[in-house]
C-alpha cells in the first residue's frame, strides 16, 4: 500500500481538481463582487475564498477520509430517505434547475447580447441561442467521445491565456484606485459576510460532494488506500489548484473593482466581464471572450447533463434510462435558461441558502467523524437542527412577493430575535452546533453505558 503520491501524480490530481471546480461561469461572480465591494474588496475576497475555494477542497477531502463512495453513501449516514432527498436536491441544483441553464445564459450575456440592438428582442434571441446551445449539449451528451476531451484540453489553456491577457491589461491600466471606489449594498456594511455568501453562487462546495468521489477514486487507483492518506493526498494536491483558483478570483475581483472608474456596477457579472473585455481589448477582445466562454460553458453543460443523467438512472433503476434523463434535463435546462442570467442567479439564492448549511454540516461531520465513530445519532441531530435553520434561511431569501405571502416579515423578526447571526445570513451556525452537542452527548452516554 502506497502512502503518498509522486510529484507527477500530485500534478495530475491537482490539474483534475482545478478542472473539476474552475469554469468560465465562475468568473461572473468575482467580477461582480469586485464592482460591488469597492474599497472593501479585500474583506469581501476573504469571504469569497472561504466558500468558493476552501469549502470545495474540504468537501473532496471529506469523501476521502470518510471512505464514502459518493454523495448518496455519505448522506446515508443520516438515513436513506434523507440521502435520497439531499442527493436529488443537490444534483437538480447543480444540474437542470440552475447551473446548466446558467451555462447558456452566461454565454449569451457575455457574447451575443453585447452586440444585439437594445430593441426589446433579446428574449427571442435568448430563446434561439439557448435552443441551439442545448441541442449541441444534448448531441454530445448522447454521443460521449474524445471530441469533448480534446476541446477541453485545447480550450482551457486558451481561455486561461486570454483571461490572463485581459486581467493583466486591466490591472496595469486601472481606471480607478480601489480606495476611491464606493462599496454598494451589503458590501458597504458587512463585506466579509457578503463575500462569504457570494461564494455560495459558485456552487463548488455542492459540486465537491457530487463529483469529488472522482478525484478520490483516482487517488485510490494510484495506490493510496489509507483514508487519512487519501484525504492528505487530496489536500496536498489541492493546494496548487486552490492557490491558482484563488489567484484567478483575486485578480478578476480587483479588475472588477477598478473598472468602476469607467463603468457603472452591472446587473450581473456576465455583463461586467463583457464590458471590461470590450473596454480594454476592443471588439476583437469581446469576440474572443465570447467564443471561449461559450465553448467552455458548452463543455461544462455536457458534463453536468451527463453526470445528472447517470446519477438519476442509478438512483431510480426502474425509471427512465440514461438517454431519457439526458433529454429531460436538457429540456428543463432550456426552459429555465430563458429566465435570463440575473433571474437564474436571483432564484437560485433561496435554494443555495438552504443547501449550503446542510452541505457544510455534512462536510464537517465527515471530516471529524473518526472522533465519534461516524455515529448516526450525531449525524441525525446535527443535520436535523441544521435543516430547521436552513429552511429559515431559504424563507428569508425568497422573492419579496412570495416572502410576504407566507408571513415572511414575522418569520424574519422571530429569527433575528432568537437566532444569532441570522441578520448575516448565517443563522444556521448556532443550531448546527447545538445539534452536534446533543448528538455527541448522547453518543458518549451510550458509549459509557456500554463499557459499564
Task: Give residue spans per PLM region.
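Hydrophobic, membrane-embedded alpha-helices of multi-pass small-molecule transporters
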Residues: 11-22, 92, 169-176, 185-252, ...
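Selective recognition of specific alpha-helical transmembrane segments in multi-pass small-molecule
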Residues: 54, 58, 158-171, 234-260, ...
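Membrane-water interface regions at transmembrane-helix termini and the short interhelical loops
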Residues: 65-69, 73, 132-155, 221-224, ...
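TM-loop-TM module centered on a large, flexible mid-protein loop between adjacent transmembrane helices
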Residues: 70-76, 248-298, 305, 314, ...
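Hydrophobic alpha-helical segments and their helix-loop junctions in multi-pass secondary transporters
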Residues: 96, 100, 160-187, 205-206, ...
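Membrane-interface loop-to-helix entry segments
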Residues: 141-170, 349-360, 379-389
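Hydrophobic, small-residue-rich membrane helices and short re-entrant helix-turn-helix hairpins
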Residues: 143-154, 192, 215-244, 262-274, ...
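A generic transmembrane alpha-helix motif of multi-pass inner-membrane proteins
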Residues: 173, 184, 375-452
Amino acid at each position: 500500500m502506497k502512502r503518498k503520491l509522486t510529484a507527477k501524480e500530485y500534478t495530475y490530481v491537482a490539474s483534475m481538481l482545478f478542472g473539476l471546480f474552475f469554469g468560465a461561469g465562475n468568473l461572473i461572480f468575482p467580477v461582480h463582487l469586485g464592482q460591488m465591494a469597492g474599497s472593501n474588496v479585500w474583506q469581501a475576497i476573504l469571504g469569497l475564498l472561504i466558500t468558493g475555494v476552501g469549502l470545495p477542497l474540504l468537501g473532496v477531502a471529506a469523501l476521502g477520509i470518510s471512505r464514502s463512495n459518493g454523495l448518496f453513501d455519505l448522506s446515508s449516514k443520516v438515513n436513506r430517505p434523507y440521502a435520497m432527498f439531499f442527493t436529488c436536491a443537490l444534483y437538480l441544483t447543480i444540474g437542470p434547475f440552475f447551473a446548466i441553464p446558467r451555462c447558456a445564459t452566461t454565454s449569451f450575456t457575455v457574447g451575443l447580447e453585447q452586440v444585439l440592438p437594445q430593441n426589446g428582442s433579446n428574449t427571442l434571441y435568448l430563446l434561439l441561442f439557448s435552443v441551439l446551445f442545448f441541442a449541441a449539449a444534448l448531441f454530445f451528451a448522447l454521443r460521449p467521445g474524445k471530441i469533448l476531451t480534446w476541446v477541453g484540453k485545447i480550450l482551457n489553456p486558451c481561455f486561461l491565456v486570454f483571461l490572463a491577457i485581459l486581467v493583466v491589461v486591466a490591472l496595469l491600466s486601472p481606471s480607478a484606485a480601489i480606495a476611491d471606489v464606493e462599496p454598494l449594498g451589503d458590501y458597504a456594511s458587512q463585506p466579509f459576510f457578503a463575500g462569504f455568501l457570494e461564494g455560495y453562487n459558485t456552487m463548488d462546495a455542492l459540486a465537491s460532494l457530487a463529483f469529488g468521489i472522482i478525484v478520490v477514486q483516482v487517488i485510490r487507483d494510484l495506490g493510496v488506500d489509507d483514508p487519512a492518506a487519501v484525504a492528505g493526498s487530496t489536500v496536498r494536491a489541492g493546494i496548487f489548484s486552490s492557490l491558482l483558483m484563488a489567484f484567478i478570483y483575486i485578480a478578476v475581483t480587483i479588475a472588477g473593482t477598478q473598472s468602476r472608474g469607467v463603468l457603472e456596477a452591472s446587473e450581473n457579472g456576465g455583463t461586467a466581464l463583457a464590458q471590461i473585455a470590450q473596454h480594454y481589448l476592443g471588439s476583437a477582445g469581446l469576440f474572443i471572450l465570447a467564443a471561449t466562454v461559450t465553448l467552455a460553458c458548452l463543455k461544462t453543460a455536457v458534463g453536468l447533463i451527463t453526470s445528472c443523467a447517470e446519477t438519476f438512472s442509478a438512483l431510480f433503476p426502474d425509471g427512465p434510462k440514461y438517454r431519457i434523463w439526458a433529454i429531460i434535463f436538457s429540456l428543463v435546462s432550456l426552459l429555465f435558461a430563458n429566465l435570463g442570467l440575473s433571474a437564474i442567479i436571483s432564484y437560485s439564492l433561496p435554494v443555495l441558502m438552504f443547501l449550503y448549511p446542510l452541505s457544510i454540516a455534512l462536510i464537517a461531520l465527515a471530516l471529524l467523524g473518526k472522533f465519534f465513530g461516524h455515529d448516526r445519532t450525531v449525524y441525525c441531530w446535527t443535520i436535523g437542527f441544521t435543516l430547521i435553520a436552513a429552511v429559515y434561511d431559504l424563507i428569508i431569501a425568497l422573492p419579496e412577493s412570495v416572502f410576504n405571502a407566507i408571513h415572511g416579515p414575522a418569520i424574519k423578526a422571530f429569527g433575528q430575535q432568537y437566532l444569532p447571526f441570522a441578520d448575516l445570513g448565517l443563522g444556521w451556525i448556532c443550531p448546527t452546533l447545538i445539534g452536534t452537542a446533543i448528538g455527541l452527548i448522547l453518543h458518549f452516554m451510550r458509549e459509557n453505558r456500554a463499557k459499564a
